[in-house]
Amino acid sequence: MYGIEYTTFLIYLISIILFNYILKSITRMMDYIIYKFLLIVTIASIVVNAQNYGINLPITGSMDASYVNATKDKPFLTSTLCLYYPTEARTEINDNEWTSTLSQLFLTKGWPTGSVYFKEYDDIATFSVDPQLYCDYNIVLMRYNSSLELDMSELANLILNEWLCNPMDITLYYYQQNGQANKWIAMGQSCTIKVCPLNTQTLGIGCQTTNTRTFEEVATAEKLVITDVVDGVNHKLDVTTATCTIRNCKKLGPRENVAVIQVGGADILDITSDPTTAPQTERMMRINWKKWWQVFYTIVDYVNQIVQAMSKRSRSLNSAAFYYRV
């Protein structure tokens, strides 16, 4: 009897000792893993020169007063820069080697030959139909034209922000906008958009749903339209679908790898007053109009200051990708 009790006691004692040994082994192993992980993180944080994406620096106003002409210490050896300019710039310069000249000048600012691409567009309206922003950094030059202020403002709003878009079937469904970030964006050769707000009984408010001539016209024969209507109210739409495509879009936030430079004009276009723009600063600036050579020289001088206010983390943009997610 006593032998059985002693045996049971020994079994319990051995089990406790074995369990304690296993627990200590696991503890030592976990300590080793944790210490090794912390060591790797510490070394990586010292070696890696990470970029802070949380800062969106304003670069509005005149460059002559706000920026210092200097070359960035670390050239962008692995980055690409696209410079978009209107056809009138090439026409005025009238020099077949002008892009080569500018490439050599960009080299003095730390941009290797072949890293800067020159992209030409016909005019603001045409560019807005098919914007293609593929480089790590994209600088868009827009010559100010008082008759095109709306087009310039809408194009800037489009390319300076990221949008999540879905198709709209206006023949079958009514649509409403939910929140200030929700817009209807239309692109095409000719976009005419009419809307008819509806009450809770789906009857037109000031219009007849069966007669599009009574609808409220919000855009006429435009190539790019960002439509904003009263939130929370269903609308029936009439769109020239043969020459225009409309999407239901939500503004996600700033597209940080794009900057817009307004060339000339008394005042800079201000899209920051839009309540959907957060933070209330954008990568827009103005430089005084003289000659296109002078404009490009100014860009070369300040290119690194411009890029420092940007981030190359944003997605590329073209019209096809824009319709689904940009």
UniProtKB/Swiss-Prot annotation:
Region (CNP motif), start-end ranges: 165-167
TM segment ranges: none
Keyword set, alphabetical order: Calcium, Capsid protein, Disulfide bond, Glycoprotein, Host endoplasmic reticulum, Host-virus interaction, Metal-binding, Outer capsid protein, Signal, T=13 icosahedral capsid protein, Virion
Entry-linked Gene3D superfamilies: Glycoprotein VP7, domain 1, Rotavirus outer-layer protein VP7, domain 2
Annotated binding of Ca(2+) 2, by residue: Q177, D228, V229, D231, D301
Highest taxon above the source species: Viruses
Glycosylated residues (UniProt): N69, N145
Disulphide-bonded residues: C82-C135, C165-C249, C191-C244, C196-C207
GO CC annotations, alphabetized: host cell endoplasmic reticulum lumen; T=13 icosahedral viral capsid; viral outer capsid
InterPro entries: VP7, VP7_1, VP7_2
PTM notes: N-glycosylated.
Signal peptide bounds: 1-50
Pfam families with a match to the protein in the record: VP7
Binding site for Ca(2+) 1: D95, G206, T214, E216
Compartments, as annotated in UniProt: Virion; Host endoplasmic reticulum lumen
Region annotation (LVD motif) ranges: 237-239
GO molecular function annotations of the record: metal ion binding
Start and end residues of each stretch annotated as GPR motif: 253-255
Similarity comment text for this entry: Belongs to the rotavirus VP7 family.
Binding partners and assembly: Homotrimer; disulfide-linked. 2 Ca(2+) ions bound at each subunit interface in the trimer hold the trimer together. Interacts with the intermediate capsid protein VP6. Interacts with the outer capsid protein VP5*.
Role summary: Calcium-binding protein that interacts with rotavirus cell receptors once the initial attachment by VP4 has been achieved. Rotavirus attachment and entry into the host cell probably involves multiple sequential contacts between the outer capsid proteins VP4 and VP7, and the cell receptors. Following entry into the host cell, low intracellular or intravesicular Ca(2+) concentration probably causes the calcium-stabilized VP7 trimers to dissociate from the virion. This step is probably necessary for the membrane-disrupting entry step and the release of VP4, which is locked onto the virion by VP7.
Miscellaneous remark of the record: Some rotavirus strains are neuraminidase-sensitive and require sialic acid to attach to the cell surface. Some rotavirus strains are integrin-dependent. Some rotavirus strains depend on ganglioside for their entry into the host cell. Hsp70 also seems to be involved in the entry of some strains.
Record-given protein name: Outer capsid glycoprotein VP7
Protein source organism: Rotavirus A (isolate RVA/Cow/Thailand/61A/1988/G10P7[5]) (RV-A)
Taxonomic placement: Viruses, Riboviria, Orthornavirae, Duplornaviricota, Resentoviricetes
